[in-house]
């Protein structure tokens, strides 16, 4: 389509009927001059020139000095026709018609003038040009438009106009031209009826002037008159189209659908209605000659739909170029803003409307998406100003419709499908091209991504998970937070390798996946990537699970699972863990939520290995890492810090989602606070494994599924472990390699401080399961050192951290008492003490059975079982099951340790067997103590938040209850203390009176001093058990800090 706007007037007016002015008198020389110039406001397309409604200005300069090159000969012809008119008359529309002569050019011209009553009067002129290049024209027909004028489509690509007994048929050269002619004629007939221009009346007398000017050749006049009899110049349909009988309704529906499709796909400027009907017949494979009237009516209806602007929203119209050129319609609809989404159409009324142009063509390669943002703001500008905006292109089908769909998607947050259906419902001819549809789909993704930034899925889901049922399964995406580089944790490469069931955990830096045979589903596989903190916490959750759940292979955490589970539920929508590891998963998931480290997740496996060697890097990369000032003191839970610089117990129990380093590692019993309140990261894991395994041997029947739900205990070194997980032979990690156990006897008896630092700081994962298993199984004869060391730990941790942990420790006890758990556990444990140990039943599936296969027969030493009595004795009572859960969870914790696990393996193996035995036994009672004191109900924890001072009132009473229940109140499993502080241990009188005699105390002090001295000796961290003596290439930063640490100790 060629749009030509000829020297548009800057002062357009809305009055369509005021085109002629009374001051213009015929014959006036000035007016004659004005009429010599062509109108400045004609809108031209191929085959039609539409007068843009001007105000008081006459049709201006009649001479077109620089005609538009792409408008064909229409501008020149229009200029000649205007010069043919009287000065007071104006052309409203000129439409080119088909001609029987190839070289002849014919126009139907609608001319209007002011009548006797200053009303608009219209006539039709038939103008002939002898050739396209002709500079002159003649009039061959004059037809007055009286009030009885009727217009009909002839079904052959034209329309008939009948009035006062005369009928003429006009066949415009294009559908677009015909549609513009029908519009103008319709309005002209309406004016004639309104003013009652009856035939033969005084109106339209001025038409006699043009009747007197008829001077065309007779052949031309005959063509104008003979057209009433002319059916069509189109030949009949080919014979191959055989008439098929069809049902009327079905055919009409099919015609409507096909016709609409054809008209939207055709360039209506270059096709006639005959051609459209031909195409329709071809597509339908039938002759539609009988239905041509129906087809024409439908075509007219579709043209009307295409031409009429569609009100999409209260402030937004979607239309075509014709709507943009109809000043009266624009002003009547309240449009003040026009968004022109075309390159070929100019702005018609730049002085009257606010325009914004998107200069693009309707092509699939056009990048329309880049303009949608500015279009959105322009449309909203109209909305803010309480006005309306017209968005138009050529037909209002593709470009402008796509822009409106994009606007709806952004403005209302709709998906593409909804926005498209809505706009198509409002404007049925809407059909964006394939390229625009692809861009709309891309735009939908952009908007979705923008919304996701504010979506709760990209934040910690504290609020939503509070309302989530505990046993309501949630997909992995429900709780996987985004890693710092934007990658969901489930998509990290080394996580995918870990998804194989039954394999040891390959994940580095305190993370691993609980991938066992009982966790085969994608939910469990993907969702169980967690941060293992202290086995004590796991034991807490296990303790709170009822016995019935313990026997099920797929147990789910119960409502009263306790403090840890409550916090987990507040952080995660994580509801379908299997077995005992269900609670573990929740605790660990909470750790992961708190402790996602930017570097920890973003690093490659080689960088992860560096993290294993460098706890400072771990701390720096972890959101949960302690401040640098606290690193040295956090080695063993800050044993000697009476008031650590952590904020509060409430802050620790309810860590912020941001995971500030200080807040996320505060000293309290929060399951998510690993560093201070919980068990020592090193000792409990050393001890938990043998305890758990001995316990499991004596209570296999009650816990048939606890083993399989936990990863295998023996893991290859960090590097090989990653390889194993991805390889087919990863199952080898399930069995303890000889190279893993043997170096434990040969390595020097030194545990580097860096390992301890790493353990207490970040790993919180059981470090040295395998060595402890190996070593613990042999020395079970000497029970005295065990009690010594246990007292040592208990008393040491009691004294210096009284203000820090007792408050938190007793806080939970108060809540336990509210829940009635302390009394129940006390009774059950007292009864447990009196129950003799059963012989070990047959081994069960899972890591525990594999583990005990590696434990020498000494592990069934009755003395050892007796020492573990309260924990390992089977019982049918619910609390017995819960008490058994503690060692099992300890076992799970130690089994699922991350790569740092191996470094401690090597150095832990350097302990004397007696020492290992004693520390293995140390946490048994304190483990139950931890479980009891920290298994407060989920509901009761809310009453504690922000009120840490309440727990001091009943400290002594609670401690007494624990001792009577056979539990020590020692802190190893509760407070994440570190062996590094053993040299400065002191005793609390309560613990001495509870479990110690003078000789025990003395021996334990000696043992502590010796162990503390060798623990202080820094040493490079080996990369795997086989290379125990190989120092790490880069010393851990904690080693560099050893002087300050030693001074503090």
Swiss-Prot record:
Keyword match Cytoplasm: yes
GO biological process: actin cytoskeleton organization; cell morphogenesis; cellular response to ATP; excitatory chemical synaptic transmission; negative regulation of actin filament polymerization; positive regulation of AMPA glutamate receptor clustering; positive regulation of excitatory postsynaptic potential; positive regulation of synaptic plasticity
Modification type Phosphoserine: residues: 37, 57, 515, 576, 897, 978
Catalytic activity: O-phospho-L-tyrosyl-[protein] + H2O = L-tyrosyl-[protein] + phosphate; O-phospho-L-seryl-[protein] + H2O = L-seryl-[protein] + phosphate; O-phospho-L-threonyl-[protein] + H2O = L-threonyl-[protein] + phosphate
Modification N-acetylalanine, positions: 2
Cellular component terms per the entry's GO annotation: cleavage furrow; cytoplasm; cytoskeleton; growth cone; lamellipodium; midbody; plasma membrane; synapse
Residue ranges of the region described as Disordered: 1-28, 456-499, 544-603, 693-787, 825-899, 923-955, 989-1049
Annotated spans, Interaction with YWHAG: 897-1049
EC number(s) on file: 3.1.3.16, 3.1.3.48
Record localization: Cytoplasm, Cytoskeleton; Cell projection, Lamellipodium; Cleavage furrow; Midbody
PTM characteristics: Phosphorylated. Inhibitory phosphorylation by PAK4 promotes binding to YWHAZ. Phosphorylation at Ser-978 is decreased by stimuli which promote actin reorganization and lamellipodia formation. Can be dephosphorylated and activated by PPP3CA/calcineurin A. Phosphorylation decreases immediately prior to telophase.
Polar residues: bias regions: 1-12, 458-468, 1001-1013
Annotated Pfam families: DEK_C, DSPc, PH_SSH1-like_1st
Coiled-coil parts of chain: none
SUPFAM superfamilies reported for this sequence: (Phosphotyrosine protein) phosphatases II, DEK C-terminal domain
Active site: 393
Biased composition (Basic and acidic residues): 564-573, 772-787
Biased composition (Low complexity): 13-25, 731-742, 925-943
PANTHER family: PROTEIN PHOSPHATASE SLINGSHOT HOMOLOG 1 (PTHR45864:SF5), SLINGSHOT PROTEIN PHOSPHATASE HOMOLOG (PTHR45864)
Note: Tyrosine phosphatase activity has not been demonstrated for this protein to date.
Family listed: Belongs to the protein-tyrosine phosphatase family.
Protein's name according to its UniProt entry: Protein phosphatase Slingshot homolog 1
Organism: Homo sapiens
């Amino acid at each position: 389509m060629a749009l030509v706007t000829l020297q548009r007037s800057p002062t357009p007016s809305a009055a369509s009927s005021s085109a002629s002015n009374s001051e213009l008198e015929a014959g006036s020389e000035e007016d004659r001059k004005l009429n010599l110039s062509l109108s400045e406001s004609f809108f031209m397309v191929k085959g039609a020139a539409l007068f843009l409604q001007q105000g008081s200005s006459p049709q201006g300069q009649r001479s077109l000095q620089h005609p538009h090159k792409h408008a064909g000969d229409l501008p020149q012809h229009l200029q000649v026709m205007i010069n043919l008119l009287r000065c007071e008359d104006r052309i409203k529309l000129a439409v080119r018609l088909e001609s029987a002569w190839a070289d002849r050019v014919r126009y139907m011209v609608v001319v209007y003038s002011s009548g006797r009553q200053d009303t608009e009067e219209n006539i039709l002129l038939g103008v002939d040009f002898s050739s396209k290049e002709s500079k002159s024209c003649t009039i061959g027909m004059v037809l007055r438009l009286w009030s009885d004028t009727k217009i009909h489509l002839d079904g052959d690509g034209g329309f008939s106009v009948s009035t006062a007994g005369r009928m003429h048929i006009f066949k415009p050269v294009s559908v677009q031209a015909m549609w513009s002619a029908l519009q103008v004629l319709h309005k002209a007939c309406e004016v004639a009826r309104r003013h009652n221009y009856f035939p033969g009346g005084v109106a339209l007398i001025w038409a006699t002037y043009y009747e007197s000017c008829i001077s065309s050749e007779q052949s031309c006049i005959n063509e104008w008159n003979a057209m009433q009899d002319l059916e069509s110049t189109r030949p009949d349909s080919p014979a191959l189209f055989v008439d098929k009988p069809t049902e009327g309704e079905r055919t009409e529906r099919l015609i409507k659908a096909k016709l609409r499709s054809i008209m939207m796909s055709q360039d209506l400027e270059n096709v006639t209605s005959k051609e459209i009907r031909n195409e329709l017949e071809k597509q339908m494979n039938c002759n539609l000659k009988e239905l041509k009237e129906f087809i024409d009516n439908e075509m007219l209806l579709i043209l009307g739909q295409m031409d009429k602007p569609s009100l999409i929203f209260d402030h937004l119209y979607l239309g075509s170029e014709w709507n943009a050129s109809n000043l009266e319609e624009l002003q009547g609809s309240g449009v003040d803003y026009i968004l022109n989404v075309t390159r070929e159409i100019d702005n018609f009324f730049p002085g009257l409307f606010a325009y914004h142009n998107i200069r693009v063509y309707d092509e699939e390669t056009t990048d329309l998406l880049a303009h949608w943002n500015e279009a959105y703001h322009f449309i909203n500008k109209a909305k803010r100003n309480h006005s309306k905006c017209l968005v138009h292109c050529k037909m209002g089908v593709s470009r402008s419709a796509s822009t409106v769909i994009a606007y709806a998607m952004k403005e209302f947050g709709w998906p593409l499908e909804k926005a498209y259906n809505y706009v198509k419902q409002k404007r049925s001819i809407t059909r964006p091209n394939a390229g625009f549809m692809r861009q709309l789909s891309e735009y939908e993704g952009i908007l979705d991504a923008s919304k996701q930034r504010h979506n709760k899925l990209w934040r910690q889901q504290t609020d939503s998970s509070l309302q989530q049922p505990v046993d309501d399964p949630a997909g992995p995406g429900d709780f996987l937070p985004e890693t710092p580089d934007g990658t969901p944790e489930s998509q990290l490469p080394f996580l995918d390798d870990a998804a194989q069931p039954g394999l040891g955990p390959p994940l580095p830096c305190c993370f691993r996946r609980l991938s066992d045979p009982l966790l085969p589903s994608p939910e469990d596989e993907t969702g169980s990537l967690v941060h293992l903190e202290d086995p004590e916490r796991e034991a807490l959750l296990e303790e709170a699970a009822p016995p019935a759940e313990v026997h099920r292979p797929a147990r789910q955490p119960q409502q009263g699972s306790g403090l840890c589970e409550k916090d987990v539920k507040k952080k995660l929508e994580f509801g379908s863990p299997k077995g005992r590891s269900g609670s573990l998963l929740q605790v660990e998931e909470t750790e992961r939520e708190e402790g996602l480290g930017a570097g920890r997740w973003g690093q490659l496996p080689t960088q992860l290995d560096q993290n294993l060697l460098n706890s400072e890097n771990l701390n720096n990369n972890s959101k949960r890492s302690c401040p640098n000032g606290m690193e040295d003191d956090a080695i063993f839970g800050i044993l000697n810090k009476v008031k650590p610089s952590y904020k509060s117990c409430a802050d620790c129990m309810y860590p912020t989602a941001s995971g500030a380093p200080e807040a996320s590692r505060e000293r309290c019993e929060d399951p998510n606070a690993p560093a201070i309140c919980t068990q020592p990261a090193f000792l409990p894991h050393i001890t938990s494994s043998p305890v758990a395994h001995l316990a499991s041997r004596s209570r296999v029947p009650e816990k048939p599924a606890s083993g399989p739900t936990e990863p295998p205990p023996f893991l290859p070194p960090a590097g090989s472990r990653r390889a194993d997980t991805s390889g087919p032979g990863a199952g080898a990690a399930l069995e303890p390699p000889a190279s893993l156990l043997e170096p434990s006897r040969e390595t020097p008896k030194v545990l580097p401080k860096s390992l301890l630092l790493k353990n207490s700081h970040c790993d919180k994962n059981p470090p040295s399961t395998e060595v402890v298993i190996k070593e613990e199984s042999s020395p079970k004869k000497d029970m005295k050192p065990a009690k010594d060391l246990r007292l040592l730990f208990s008393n040491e941790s009691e004294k210096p951290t009284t203000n820090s942990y007792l408050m938190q420790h007793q806080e939970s006890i108060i809540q336990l008492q509210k829940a009635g758990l302390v009394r129940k556990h006390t009774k059950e444990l007292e009864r447990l003490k009196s129950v003799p140990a059963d012989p070990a039943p047959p081994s069960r599936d899972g890591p525990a059975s594999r583990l005990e296969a590696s434990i020498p027969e000494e592990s069934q030493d009755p003395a050892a079982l007796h020492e573990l009595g309260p924990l390992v004795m089977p019982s049918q009572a619910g609390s017995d099951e819960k008490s058994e859960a503690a060692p099992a969870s300890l076992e799970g914790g130690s089994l699922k340790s991350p790569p740092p696990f191996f470094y401690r393996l090597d150095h832990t193996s350097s302990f004397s067997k007696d020492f290992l035995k004693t520390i293995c036994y140390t946490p048994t009672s304190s483990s139950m103590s931890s479980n009891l004191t920290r298994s407060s109900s989920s509901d009761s924890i809310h009453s504690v938040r922000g009120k840490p001072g309440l727990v001091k009132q009943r400290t002594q009473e609670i401690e007494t209850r624990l001792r009577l229940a056979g539990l020590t109140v020692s802190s190893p499993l509760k407070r994440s203390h570190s062996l590094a502080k053993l040299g400065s241990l002191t005793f609390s009188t309560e613990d001495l009176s509870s479990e110690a005699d003078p000789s025990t105390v003395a021996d334990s002090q000696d043992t502590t001093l010796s162990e503390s001295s060798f623990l202080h000796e820094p040493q490079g961290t080996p990369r795997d058990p086989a290379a125990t003596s190989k120092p790490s290439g880069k010393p851990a930063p904690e080693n560099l800090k050893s002087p300050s640490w030693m001074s503090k100790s």
